[in-house]
Amino acid sequence: MFNEITKSVIWNRQVLEISTGKIARQADAAVTVKMGNSILLCTCVVANKVKDGIGFFPLTINYREMAYSAGKIPGGFLKREGKASDKEILVSRLIDRPIRPLFHQAFIHETHITCSVLSYDPETPVDILAIIGASAALSISPAPYLEIVAASKVGLINGEFVLNPTLELLKTSQLDLVVAGTKDSVMMVESEAHLLSEEKMLEAIKFGFENFQTVIKLIKEFAKEAKKPKFEMQDLYPSSLKKEIGKLFAKEIEQAFAIKSKQERNANLALIHEKVLTHFVCDIENKKYNNYQIESTLKAISADILRNKILEQNIRIDGRSTTDIRQIACEVGLLPSAHGSALFTRGETQSLVSTTFGTSLDEQIVDSLEGEYKERFMLNYIFPPYSVNEAMPMKAPSRREVGHGKLAWRAINPILPNKVQFPYSIRVVAETTESNGSSSMATVCGSSLALMYAGVPIKAPVAGIAMGLIKEGDKFAILSDIIGDEDYFGDMDFKVAGTSKGITALQMDIKISGIDFKIIQVALEQARHGRLHILEQMNKIISKPNSELSKNAPSSTTIKIDKDKIKDIIGPGGKIIKEICETSNAKIDISDDGTVSVYAADRDKIKVALDKIKAIAVEPEIGEIFNGTVMKVLDSGAFINYLGNKDGFVHISEISETRIDKVSSVLKQGDIVKVKLIGFDNKGKAKLTIKNACKDHSLNNPKQKNNVKEDSEPEQRRDASKKRTWNEDNNTEMSEVITERKYFT
């Protein structure tokens, strides 16, 4: 019944198996990939006809994680898989990036690739298997796929590179890198790193590249037996068409590229585009040429003009040399109600970034195949249409926004303090208010500024830069800080973020058939110089975290209690902890190890909550001194309330060093006194003393009795309205206003 074809190889001490012919046989191509207990189904479906009027290659890639693959039922009200999670979107993009450039340029049939996780094994990297499966499916599909792609994951543990590390190993790794490519060149790199040098990063890329060659050989052998006939493709750029467009419009295109302003330049290029389509309208109607051929040929001619000027004259669109960085302007503290804010502007690209602190209750809960976990640091990248002057509605976050946000997250995450050093959850929102290339790297720079201004004790400032490539034969030029057109007409988008000490994130996408390691090495070194220049400009406005938090940030404190007391604080059905939160207006988080974190808007609210918690959880010890309130006065002494709900008795002889005839002459109901626990009677009632608690304490001074000091004075807190700006043009600090406020930690 089944005509199954299976190939396997030992890869990194595990069996990697790919097969076809058993599942999803009606799809143009369907491949099952297996490693360990992980099984993925990767399918490829290609439309038979091209849609009329289409002017691009409609490739859609979807990666899906089925809950049953990990023996789980989906959470939420509807117990089924819904919209794609962030991880599914990120892996979909990871598959897309090395594959898209390798289709024939003239191929515009709608193509859908779906990779579904059917069985999940945490010991194997399913994202890598998805790339391998998609490549294998394309290799046996009718789509004109020019090269076979494979991928590998690389970790760095104890100074040694590790191939395809497990999730557990990645927790201790200095590097989490995915590299994909063909047998001859690298196509895509994605990584998060803990301050790795450029040399070490290049070594890691080489290590990953060398180790996936085994998989490329496996897919080639598999495709020989299982492949189907490919679509026959025509020349995308008919020579007659290219000659005619060049003759009529090349001069106008060259003049348009001489305009430095993005808006004016784009307006001129759009006008030329309309002229070209109008000129060839009859040829389109007669089906001599199609829209895609005309638009692609126009793009190719435009690219040739731009690229030749860079390669031959070392001059870019905006007049910069290949290594020049656009002008930079920085400003912090411009949003007075935010906990931290910054505006980072580089040329015509601008990012407005805000930082907000929350409690552990505000952490993002993530439900994944590995299980449920929390993300303490959240970074949201927003790309509104107005940033590129487009009249479009605001929609839910796009795949691009999710991807750019995750890249910026990877750049910032390695330099954040741990939860012990900084107990807050952190949300960064980066809104791209202007865009002309490299907006994700502007997000990194703006996020670093906003975090430092907010007072987050990051390890070092971080900056990011996007590099480009123009390559013709053996001749190439690496471009620093690319703009939109250089990205669009160029051969590479290479983004590097890091501190002055090393790289924290790297992302590389190639638009040609691949590049060699010499180009990567040059790009990394040129990016390092650019990154240091950007950091220098950022440091002129703020070079280290503020020592104080914003007055708008929540106060917090943490105490440790006996684990056996947790149930007492929570109470039946959460009754006690709810009552504490309601009466104090504080948020309380209790960990299983007995760590209690209290968050509130000010110190007084925290104190109310802490007093109630201590009253329940803290057992007083003999010799301890407390603040107490006189509840009732008797002839023989007085009853004192201390630690919230605990009562004790002070005998008349323990009130003062001098003889007292009447207790009421010294103590009155409601008086605040210091008391010391000296023991318990035979019924377990606390015995207290006043005279030994504070011998120089004047009971007759009402101010002293009602103004008991806390054990520690509150520190200073910064006013968020403190504002600093830096503009590279005039090298002046424009304004600085400081207001102080007390807070409690």
From Swiss-Prot:
Give the matching Gene3D superfamilies: GHMP Kinase, N-terminal domain (3.30.230.70), K Homology domain, type 1 (3.30.1370.10), Nucleic acid-binding proteins (2.40.50.140)
List positions binding Mg(2+).
Answer: 487, 493
Domain S1 motif: start-end pairs? 623-691
Subcellular location, record wording: Cytoplasm
Entry's PROSITE patterns? KH_TYPE_1 (PS50084), S1 (PS50126)
Which EC numbers characterise this protein's activity in its record? 2.7.7.8
Enzyme category, top tier: transferase
Catalytic reaction annotation: RNA(n+1) + phosphate = RNA(n) + a ribonucleoside 5'-diphosphate
BP terms from Gene Ontology? mRNA catabolic process; RNA processing
Report the InterPro entries cross-referenced here: ExoRNase_PH_dom1, ExoRNase_PH_dom2, ExoRNase_PH_dom2_sf, KH_dom, KH_dom_type_1, KH_dom_type_1_sf, NA-bd_OB-fold, PNPase
Lineage top rank: taxon: Bacteria
Return the Basic and acidic residues bias intervals.
707-719
Provide one Gene Ontology cellular component: cytosol
Q: Which cofactor does it need?
A: Mg(2+)
**Any GO MF annotation of the entry:** magnesium ion binding
This protein's UniProt keywords: Cytoplasm, Magnesium, Metal-binding, Nucleotidyltransferase, RNA-binding, Transferase
Q: Which family does it belong to?
A: Belongs to the polyribonucleotide nucleotidyltransferase family.
Q: What does this protein do?
A: Involved in mRNA degradation. Catalyzes the phosphorolysis of single-stranded polyribonucleotides processively in the 3'- to 5'-direction.
NCBIfam families annotated for this entry?
Answer: polynuc_phos, PRK11824.1
Q: What is this protein called?
A: Polyribonucleotide nucleotidyltransferase
> Which organism is this entry from?
Rickettsia typhi (strain ATCC VR-144 / Wilmington)
Give the gene symbol: pnp
